[in-house]
Amino acid sequence: MTYYQITEILHDTLTDSRVDFTTITHGSIEDVDLARQTIFPLAHITPSTATLADKTISFSMNVAALDIVDYNKNNLRDETNPFYGTDNKIDVLSDLITRLQIAVDIIRRKLADRNVAIETSITNTPFVDRFENLLAGWETTLTIIVPNSAVNQGAC
C-alpha cells in the first residue's frame, strides 16, 4: 500500500456519511483558510513520519478535527450552571471525538481487508482557542503499518 492509497482511504473515510466532515484538507494547516465559515467541521491531514523497517513502513498521520465554537453574550457569572460556560465547546469536543472514533473504526476495517495494520492505541488530544477564529477540536495521530513493497518485490 502506498502513501497515496493511505491518504485516499483517510479522505474517503472522513467524507463518509457516518463521519461527515464538510471539508477535508491535506498538508500544512497554515495553507487552509480557517476564516471561511462554510468549511466546518473540517478534518485536516498532516503527514508526520514514515519509518522504514526491514519489511514494513510505518506512516504516522496527524488528523485534526476542527469546528467553530459559538459564544453567547451572557456573562459567565450570570449563568445558572457555569460549568457549561457561555459557549458550546463541550458540544464541539463531544461531537468531534465521536466522529474521530467512528472514522478510526472504519479505517481499521478498511485496512484489515488489505492486511494492513493500524496501531491499536490511539491518543486524541483536545485543543481550544488554538486558532484565532474560535476553533476547538481534537488532534490524533494514526500510525499505519504497511508491507515495504520495494523490499518484498526484491527491488532493493
Where are these predicted regions, by residue range?
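Short, charged interaction patches at domain edges and termini
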Residues: M1-D12, L52-S58, R109-C156
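A short, highly charged nucleic-acid-interacting micro-segment common to nuclease
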Residues: M1-E8, K89-I97
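Small/polar-rich, solvent-exposed N-terminal microdomains that initiate assembly or binding
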Residues: M1-T56, K110
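Short, well-structured alpha-helical interface segments that form or flank functional binding sites
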Residues: Q5, Q37-F40, S58, D95-T98, ...
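Ordered hydrophobic segments in well-structured contexts
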Residues: F40-T46, N62, G137-E139
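Short glycine-rich beta-strand segments
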Residues: N62-Y71, I145-P147
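A solvent-exposed, charged loop/short amphipathic helix patch at secondary-structure junctions
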Residues: Y71-S94
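Short, hydrophobic/π-rich interface segment
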Residues: D91-E119
